[in-house]
Each structure stands twice: as structure tokens, then as C-alpha cells.
């Protein structure tokens, strides 16, 4: 997983 994807997941609150 790329950091950018993890950031998006955290932003969505998933």
C-alpha cells in the first residue's frame, strides 16, 4: 500500500 492511499483512508475515516 502506498502512503497516499493510507492518507486517503485516514481522511475518509475508514
From Swiss-Prot:
Modified residues (Leucine amide): 14
Alphabetic keyword roster: Amidation, Antibiotic, Antimicrobial, Secreted
Entry's family note: Belongs to the frog skin active peptide (FSAP) family. Hyposin subfamily.
Annotated tissue distribution: Expressed by the skin glands.
Cellular localisation: Secreted
GO BP, one annotated term: killing of cells of another organism
Domain of life: Eukaryota
Function comment: Antibacterial peptide active against X.axonopodis pv. glycines (MIC=42 uM). Not active against E.coli ATCC 25922, S.aureus ATCC 29313 or P.aeruginosa ATCC 27853.
Descriptive protein name: Hyposin-H6
GO cellular component, one term: extracellular region
